[in-house]
C-alpha cells in the first residue's frame, strides 16, 4: 500500500497538527502522531508524513508484535533501516519516546506520602515498569507512610526473579522502616499474579507479622499497567498487618 497524498493536499481541518489542536493528542491515530514528529514525508513513492507514519507501523508490524512495543525500545539504526527515515527523523522519534517514558516514570519527592497503590507505582516505575528482566524492589515508609526510599533487591531473568524473604526482612530493619511495600515487574506486561507471587506474598505477610512491621501491599508492574495484590486477593484478611 502506498500513500501519495501530501499534507498540503489534505483539508486543514484534517491535518495532524490542526487535529491535535482541535481534538487533543489522545484522539489522533498513531500514524498521525508520528507524522507530527516526522514533519515531512518521502521514502519510496514520495509518501506524505502521514503515509510515512503508516509505513513505519507496517514495517514494525512485520516482527509479529505490536508496533508500539517495538518502537519503545528501538535503536536509531533500526529506525533508519526503514526507507524514508534518516538520522533527523529517527532521533526525533526516539527522543519523543524517551520523553514519554520519563514523564510516566517521574518519581515522587522524598517524604511524599505513599497513600495508594498508584503513588507506590509512581515511586517504582523508573526501576521496574519497562525492564526486560524481572526486578524485585521494596518501598520503605515511615510511621506516617511517608517515603523513606526505594531499593531494587534482586534482578532475575525475563520470566522470574528469586527472592529470599529473609533478605527483605533484613533490609526493612536496616532502613528503619515502619511499613513496607514490595513490588516486582512482569516483562510480558501481564500483571496477573502467578501462584509463586501469591505464595511469596503469603510468606512475607507471615514474616512481617513476626517483626511487627506491616506489609502494605505487593504490586506487580508491567507495560504501563499494575496490579495490587492487597486489592486483588484476600491475603491481607487472612494475615492481618498491624
Curated annotation (Swiss-Prot):
Where, by residue number, does Zn(2+) bind? 184, 186, 197
- At the top level, the lineage of the source is Bacteria
CDD domains hit by this protein:
MPN_DUF2466
Q: Which InterPro entries does the protein's record reference?
A: MPN, RadC_JAB, UPF0758, UPF0758_CS, UPF0758_N
Motif extent (JAMM motif): 184-197
Keyword Protease listed? The answer is yes
Q: Which NCBIfam families match?
A: PRK00024.1, radc
Would you tell me the protein name for this molecule? UPF0758 protein cce_2495
Source organism of the structure: Crocosphaera subtropica (strain ATCC 51142 / BH68) (Cyanothece sp. (strain ATCC 51142))
